[in-house]
Amino acid sequence: HSIIFHSPAIGLSGLTFLCFCILYGPTITYFPLLADILYKATPSHIGAVFTVASLGTAAIAMNLAWLGRKYSHRRLMLSATCCYVVAQTLMLVLPDAVSSLWWLTLPIFIGGVAQGLTFPLLNARMTTLAPTRNRAIVMAMNGTVLRLSQSLSPLFFGIGWSYIGWRGPYAMGIGVALVIGALVWRGYPVSSEKE
């Protein structure tokens, strides 16, 4: 209990939950619906766009060790927050401005970059919260948070879709990204600086 309900563990779990909310809500659940409704996109086209997100994640993941030596983890998390905000904002405005689905690869790529920063950094930080013998407890809790986010985020962002259509999940995504930024700014452990 002292490990699970430790303040840093709760904060990091909250960040993990919110980051996965953006992934499983606006991106994985509602982007295919948007692509179908606005662009009549085929499943293969939607899959190709998602591949771009994977490329963004991979590009950052391959350079994360170098970035971690050059910049503090807190700064990287704030940069990821900016990426989330930019990606969600572009998803909100681009469909009204462009006629091709392929323009949406830009925000999807930027979102992939954000994922490539946040998920490894949060996982790495979580593993430092407990001695080796108790690390499985922390990681199991982290996995539970992930699954909870996976289950609840489509329902949560669906409220926005229900009230204002396809723009709803992305407007809510901007709000969630700003909450992530506020949590990182005020509470991300200073001890993670240039680890």
Question: Which residue ranges define each predicted feature?
Answer:
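Juxtamembrane intracellular "pre-TM" segments in multi-pass secondary transporters
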Residues: 1-14
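Short amphipathic helix-loop junctions that connect adjacent transmembrane helices
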Residues: 29-44
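Interfacial helix-cap and linker-helix signal at transmembrane-aqueous boundaries
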Residues: 35-36, 67-68, 159-165
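Helix-to-loop junctions at the C-terminal end of transmembrane segments
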Residues: 60-73, 161
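C-terminal ends and interior cores of transmembrane alpha-helices
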Residues: 83-97
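Intracellular juxtamembrane helix-capping segments at the cytosolic ends
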Residues: 117-130
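A late C-terminal transmembrane helix in Major Facilitator Superfamily
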Residues: 129-163
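A membrane-interface helix-boundary motif in multi-pass transporters
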Residues: 159-177
